[in-house]
Amino acid sequence: MFWHEVHKADQLLTLEINSWDSFITDPIWQFFSDKLVWAPMYAAIIALLIWKLGWKKGLIVLAGALLTFGFCDQASNIVKHAVGRIRPLHDEFMIAHGLNVLEKGGGYSFFSAHSANSFGLAFSTFIGMKRCLANGEATMPKWLKAYGGWMFFCATMVAISRIFVGKHYLGDVIVGIIIGSIAGYIFARLASFACSRVR
């Protein structure tokens, strides 16, 4: 009974957010939801890591980010199949109540791998660089603050986009953000420990 009520509330909140659609914003959400458009940014992040940290520490932080991705993907797949929650775009109640669908797709909904991966990347690289800075600066440099702001902005947009394209419920996104943030933080701390052993 409790989880049924939680699911119903999640459906209604998702429908409310999803209803804030327009011909102007829909392409924006599709852009942020598309994995392929982020390839140039991934390349830029790798270049930034090596430039600012040196190749050894840069590769350590990169390894932390890759481990975060791997963990979030595997955790999402396991939980999705264990829970078996269908996506909003396949839910008769959601469709009947006007869900705006911008992307098709199968599989299960809980939890959002996009949200987990985007926040995992933001946390693992931002905290990883902050703690592994090659020059050991005591204060955070402006470029790193700008990087953190940009990464968390993008992560938020990616997460929200999953609701607007009709692929996930709000609850899927929130849980994905939490899991990705925790995983990213843990792997960033492990990377910083490894960096402390490198000269």
Regions found by a protein language model. Name each.
Residues M1-F2, G58, L62-L66, A188-R199:
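Multi-pass membrane proteins that catalyze or facilitate reactions on polyprenyl-/lipid-phosphate substrates
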Residues M1-Y42, S76-G106:
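N-terminal transmembrane-helix/juxtamembrane module of multi-pass inner/ER membrane proteins
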Residues H4-E16, K57-L66, Y108-G120:
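Hydrophobic alpha-helical transmembrane segments
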Residues I17, I45, F71-A75, V79, ...:
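Alpha-helical membrane-inserting segments
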Residues L36, A63-I78, I174, I178, ...:
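Hydrophobic, lipid-facing residues on alpha-helical transmembrane segments of integral membrane proteins
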Residues M41-K52, F126-C132:
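Hydrophobic, aromatic-rich transmembrane alpha-helices
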Residues I46-A75, G148:
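Interfacial segments of alpha-helical transmembrane regions
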Residues N100-R199:
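Membrane-embedded catalytic cores of phosphoryl/pyrophosphoryl-handling enzymes
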